[in-house]
């Protein structure tokens, strides 16, 4: 399993762009593309996981473990009292849990568990963060940097603190890798905090559906219109691959052939 490192504490727009490119290249199936957009592999391709190590300005780190075939965050690790401390979402199966534990913290003599006692769904994370929508949780490099420091090496923290970190990290890492539009939102707002707009949320919620629609398109036309949201919350109807292609980073895995260019 390979580790992609991102120095959040010394980040620039270019370094973030390079991080995104590295993550996409590490995760994608080198043989799959639809309309020029790279696709994630099916769940059998090894390595099955990707690690993303985030470092803050004071060199504290948190390592996220992503399932390669869909970029879902399964858990994370930090260094606590000189030991590798691992945290796993409670909706991860026992088989995968063992994988997470052994991948994040390979040394069984120097590790300890601090469970995430809730699941990885956005609705749950929002609830734990005390918001009705993740549009209320600001994203940004400084926020990610300070969130790392609230968890890494800290003995106790609230579910709220942890869920806020996870909402920020999942969107700035996994969602930004899936969607160039989200990566570009981070870059456009690089030196300030920002609230994810309705288009960001709409893309996040429809990634599977969008991937399927692009995969099944005929000569660039979708077989049925996709109804999404614009940044200003108006309805966005997508009829052709070209209309959404600039926003895409990676497609979710869909079996069967598609038009590659």
From Swiss-Prot:
Q: So which domain of life are we looking at?
A: Eukaryota
Q: Hey, which family's this protein in?
A: Belongs to the ribosome-inactivating protein family. Type 1 RIP subfamily.
Which species?
A: Phytolacca dioica
Name of protein: Ribosome-inactivating protein PD-L3/PD-L4
Q: Which Pfam families match?
A: RIP
Catalytic center residues: 175
Classification via InterPro entries: Ribosome-inact_prot_sf, Ribosome_inactivat_1/2, Ribosome_inactivat_prot, Ribosome_inactivat_prot_CS, Ribosome_inactivat_prot_sub1, Ribosome_inactivat_prot_sub2
Write the record's keywords in alphabetical order, separated by commas.
Answer: Disulfide bond, Glycoprotein, Hydrolase, Plant defense, Protein synthesis inhibitor, Toxin
- Residue ranges annotated as transmembrane are none
Q: Which reaction does it catalyse?
A: Endohydrolysis of the N-glycosidic bond at one specific adenosine on the 28S rRNA
Q: What is its EC number?
A: 3.2.2.22
């Amino acid at each position: 399993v390979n580790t992609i490192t991102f120095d959040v504490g010394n980040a620039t727009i270019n370094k973030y762009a390079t991080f995104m490119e590295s993550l996409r290249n590490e995760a994608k199936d080198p043989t799959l593309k639809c309309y020029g957009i790279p696709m994630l592999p099916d769940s059998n391709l090894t390595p099955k996981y990707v690690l993303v190590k985030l470092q803050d300005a004071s060199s504290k780190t948190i390592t996220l473990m992503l399932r390669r075939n869909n970029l879902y965050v399964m858990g994370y690790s930090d260094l606590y009292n000189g030991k590798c401390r691992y945290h796993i979402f409670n909706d991860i199966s026992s088989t995968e849990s063992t994988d997470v534990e052994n991948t994040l913290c390979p040394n069984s003599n120097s590790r300890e568990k601090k469970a995430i006692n809730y699941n990885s769904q956005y609705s749950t994370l929002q609830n734990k963060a005390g918001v009705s929508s993740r549009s209320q949780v600001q994203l940004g490099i400084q926020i990610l940097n300070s969130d790392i420091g609230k968890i890494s090496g800290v003995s106790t923290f609230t579910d709220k603190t942890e869920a806020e970190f996870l909402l920020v990290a999942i969107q700035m890492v996994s969602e930004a890798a899936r969607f160039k539009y989200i990566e570009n939102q981070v870059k456009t707002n690089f030196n300030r905090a920002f609230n994810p707009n309705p288009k960001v949320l709409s893309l996040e919620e429809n990634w599977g559906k969008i991937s399927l629609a692009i995969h099944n398109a005929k000569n660039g036309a979708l077989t049925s219109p996709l109804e999404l949201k614009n940044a200003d919350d108006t309805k966005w109807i997508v009829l052709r691959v070209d209309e959404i292609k600039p926003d895409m980073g990676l497609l979710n895995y869909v079996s069967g052939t598609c038009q590659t260019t």
